[in-house]
Amino acid sequence: LIFDNEKFEFDKITKKEIARLRRKTAFVFQNYNLFLNKTALQNVTEGLIVARKMHKAEAIEIGKKALDKVGLSDRYDYYPSQLSGGQQQRVAIARAIATNPEIIFFDEPTSALDPELTGEVLSVMRDLANEGMTMLVVTHEMGFARTVSNKVIFMEDGVIVEQGSSKEFFENPKEERTKAFLRTIQGDMD
């Protein structure tokens, strides 16, 4: 893996290199991975305080800004059980952006959401993209991928079938499998 002009060989990666990579990246999982016994703000600040050894006051300031950014300024003291799925996922996104990563990995961030809540999460992700945040997103939201991504990789059974710019992929696919896939989901992209 080459990341930030630094080469990492995973078969001989050191603990120091892993730590360096972790400081530059953040993850948002499909099932939120929030601490159920912590408020939204505590979920965002936990990693800053424990892993990054940040002072609590500074972590709280950063955590509030991150929650504000995802539209949850009125939910600092709410527990996950008091939040909708979309709000929980936005807390997870706030937790990721609070670490000021160079890239955020999203693993199907809307797959566990009701269709009505999907839009609020995609809106936050669209805002991040517009601000220049680098994101690697595993998604089935093809309309979102088409409008937000600058590169699309289509995989099947762990193998890359096709890759290219968003425009090339959606408007001029090369592979028959890609063409068949796009025909099947055409209605979902409108």
What spans do the regions from the language model cover?
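Catalytic Walker B motif of ABC-type/P-loop ATPase nucleotide-binding domains
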Residues: 104-107
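Conserved signature/switch motifs of ABC ATPase nucleotide-binding domains
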Residues: 78-81, 99, 131
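ABC ATPase "signature
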Residues: 163-164
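Short coil-to-helix segment of the ABC ATPase nucleotide-binding domain corresponding to the Q-loop/switch region
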Residues: 38-46
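H-loop/switch region of ABC-family ATPase nucleotide-binding domains
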Residues: 139-140
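ABC ATPase NBD coupling module
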Residues: 2-26, 57, 172-173
